[in-house]
Amino acid sequence: MAVSGSHRPLTGPQAESWTAEYLTARGLRLIERNYRCRLGEIDLVMAEGATLVFVEVRYRSGKRYGGALASVDRHKCRRLLATAQHYMVEHRVTGAVRLDVVAVSPGAAGPQAEWIRNAIEAQ
């Protein structure tokens, strides 16, 4: 997703849309955006083959506070896991699942992504 030729910072929804396109171009299939329940929100629910993939999109326009990945702390991980488990129960998911994080940051030629597969594991 090009942001109309400018190098303006993305908004959260733009970063999520850009990430959905980025992952789709790499073989994943979008199932749902912004799944919400009382426990939290999952930005993207996708599939890679038979594996259900929950995707947390993090965007920071700079590294002042450690960048996008630094914003995924222990509390955020617990909320994401709980929300993913809620989705799995609600949708009767029994197959393989994983939780990925995509950190989006501005680059000279447009957004850049750091995709971490299976970034968050249940303890």
Swiss-Prot record:
SUPFAM superfamilies: Restriction endonuclease-like. GO terms for molecular function: nucleic acid binding. It comes from the Bacteria. InterPro entries: Restrct_endonuc-II-like, tRNA_endonuc-like_dom_sf, UPF0102_YraN-like. Belongs to the UPF0102 family. PANTHER family: UPF0102 PROTEIN YRAN (PTHR34039:SF1). This is UPF0102 protein MCA0184. It comes from Methylococcus capsulatus (strain ATCC 33009 / NCIMB 11132 / Bath).
